[in-house]
């Protein structure tokens, strides 16, 4: 059985290999046909015109120009520092040199702004060349600068106005907050111009205290209006409420005076209460019954003050 199974598998593999060989041969034939067709098309196509050759040659000539422009951007500052000495052409004036410096250096930073502007010019030129291939745009040669000692390079950049960034504007605004008549710090201005100048005192219920203090804050800063409102608040109360309030005040004042009078008339309490027993004596002169009676009197006493008995410390 195993032998028959192996024979069937080998036959199936051989048939698969033959199919793969046939498919590979057919693919090779198709590739050969495609190559022949391409060669025939290439031979039958007409030769290119000279105008097309010129348009194809334009991008190849622009590659070194772009490289030169990038190198000019990166080496602009280094050439200025080394004080390059080159003669200005007769048709170029210092004003055009200043305009050129403004064109190459308009932005927040001297390298990023010039690079971005140069890339935009390259994109515009490439689009124009793709639209009209016969026209070739060329930039005017960059005017050279004089020596730094003569002041030509520095004078060309004097008329340029650098725009302010957002951080500079914010910094000026923050500095302007504290510049007043009293010239306080901005933290002092913030604390003095706040709505509530009273100290915050929180009790057990902090949230309720916060809400109460917030509700008690005046809407306007004038204190005279607040006093008028407070006086009017008591005047608008009903007559019965005022009478009951005065009665409560009188009652409390009477209780306070009564307590003070009772304290003055009270007899000074002894440190050791009078228990109604005979004076204490040494232990061996008393009997057990007297000791038990004294202990019960001490337990039934309602005095909240400590009992200090220097003479009878041995009994207690």
From Swiss-Prot:
Where found, per UniProt? Nucleus; Cytoplasm
Question: What is written about domains in the entry's comments?
Answer: Contains 2 Inka boxes (also named iBox or inca box). The Inka boxes bind and inhibit PAK4 by binding a substrate-like manner.
Q: Which residue ranges are recorded for the region named Inka box 1?
A: 182-219
Main localisation: nucleus
A GO MF term: protein serine/threonine kinase inhibitor activity
Q: Which UniProt keywords apply?
A: Cytoplasm, Nucleus
Function per UniProt: Inhibitor of the serine/threonine-protein kinase pak4/pak5. Acts by binding pak4/pak5 in a substrate-like manner, inhibiting the protein kinase activity. Required for the proper migration of neural crest cells during embryonic development, probably by inhibiting pak4/pak5.
Establish whether keyword Cytoplasm is in the entry: yes
User: Mind telling me what this protein is named?
Assistant: PAK4-inhibitor inka1
Q: Which organism's genome codes for this protein?
A: Xenopus laevis
Q: What induces it?
A: Expression is regulated by the transcription factor AP-2-alpha/tfap2a.
Bias class Acidic residues marks the residues at 119-128
Deleted gene: phenotype: Dramatic reduction in craniofacial cartilage formation.
Q: Which Gene3D superfamilies match?
A: Phosphorylase Kinase, domain 1
Subunit info? Interacts with pak4/pak5.
**Residue span of region Disordered:** 108-130
Cystine connections: none
Q: Which GO terms describe its cellular component?
A: cytoplasm; nucleus
Annotated spans, Inka box 2: 289-316
State the similarity comment. Belongs to the INKA family.
